[in-house]
């Protein structure tokens, strides 16, 4: 997660084992802790006897599962938000679980099926479009932060327009991000007749017509063995908290914006690479970058390219930010932000 700029996990759709929270405490991952309540098969009909969320017969079950989560996990600093459950309708039982948690704890509570009702502190829709997010953000009557509890369903090329989401999210403070559905592909390793490895899914087992979910289980941003996919790289790039902006070829300057909340940019090494038709022709350091959270600095970065390295071909310049000192899971030199700009001719 850290390597690819992920800072939050939602424990959909039930609490995780205790060791998970200890690791999140240690490594600095925000947790949206979700109660073990998921009953969308019963529908969302608010009439009594419809959705279980509004059925008094199930009130104790809702309370029990919510309180089990709270009592076990309440002392973990990584838990910053409580989630009442997932796709289980709304109604009396969730009004009660919300009020009960509020009497015990000051942390925010979210619940997707509450939509814009009162029993959620965060508006947390699923799979809202970028245009919908902007419409919400521009509506002055909307005061609750919006966090997409699920978005960018990572099947196929789902993350192909991921930047479109974050262009909007970063534009409006009321938009606070989201949780990609989901993290890891669920598949088994197998080999072809010529001994090449591949990942299987529904339809690869049993006779034709055997019930399965097809490829609906291959929807993560990493492979089943946790190796990276193209989507992983796209996610890490879009999520990066260091932005390289407004490169000026004439003055050899670039703006560097710090989107971190707590970290100064002096903990990173900055450098650039110039490529001609993909081949590296020059690299250099960008020295003495200091920018507090939320601040932007403009810096010069070229002391002149040696004459024999000058080029007039298909030229691109790449900027990088890398960790100076090793951190847990992140060796020194790990690149956590990058940008590429088309230059064409350079000097």
Regions found by a protein language model. Name each.
Residues 268-314, 318-332:
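Intrinsically disordered, low-complexity Pro/Gly/Ser/Thr-rich segments with frequent PxxP/GP/PP motifs
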Residues 1-255, 259-266, 271-283:
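Extended substrate-binding grooves/exosites of carbohydrate-active enzymes
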Residues 326-347:
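Short beta-strand elements
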């Amino acid at each position: 997660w850290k390597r690819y700029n992920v800072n939050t996990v939602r424990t959909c759709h039930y609490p995780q084992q205790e060791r998970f929270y200890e690791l999140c405490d240690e490594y600095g991952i925000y947790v949206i802790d979700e109660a073990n309540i998921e009953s969308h098969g019963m529908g969302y009909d608010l009439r009594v006897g419809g959705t279980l969320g509004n059925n008094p017969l199930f009130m104790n079950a809702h309370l029990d599962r919510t309180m089990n989560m709270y009592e076990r996990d309440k002392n973990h600093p990584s838990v910053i938000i409580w989630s009442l459950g997932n796709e289980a309708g709304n109604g009396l039982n969730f009004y009660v679980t919300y009020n009960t948690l509020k009497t015990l704890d000051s942390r925010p509570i979210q619940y997707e099926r509450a939509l814009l009702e009162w029993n959620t502190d965060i508006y947390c829709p699923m799979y809202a479009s970028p245009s919908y997010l902007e419409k919400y953000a521009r509506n002055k009557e909307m005061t609750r932060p919006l966090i997409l509890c699920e978005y960018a369903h990572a099947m196929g090329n789902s993350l192909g327009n991921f930047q479109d989401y974050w262009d909007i999210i970063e534009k409006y403070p009321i938009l606070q991000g989201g949780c990609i559905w989901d993290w890891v592909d669920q598949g088994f390793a197998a080999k072809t007749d010529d001994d090449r490895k591949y990942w299987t899914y529904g339809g690869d087992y049993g006779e034709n017509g055997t019930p399965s979910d097809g490829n609906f289980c291959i929807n993560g941003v990493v492979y089943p063995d946790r190796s990276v996919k193209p989507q992983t790289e796209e996610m890490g790039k879009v999520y990066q908290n260091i932005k390289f902006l407004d490169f000026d070829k004439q003055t050899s300057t670039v703006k560097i914006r710090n989107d971190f909340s707590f970290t100064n940019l002096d903990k990173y090494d900055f450098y650039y690479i110039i490529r001609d038709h993909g081949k590296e022709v020059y690299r250099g350091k960008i020295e003495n970058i200091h920018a507090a959270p939320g601040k932007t600095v403009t810096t010069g970065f070229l002391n002149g390219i040696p004459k024999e390295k000058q080029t007039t071909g298909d030229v691109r310049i790449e900027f990088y930010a890398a960790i100076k000192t090793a951190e847990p899971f992140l060796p020194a030199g790990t690149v956590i932000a990058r940008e590429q700009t088309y230059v064409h001719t350079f000097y």
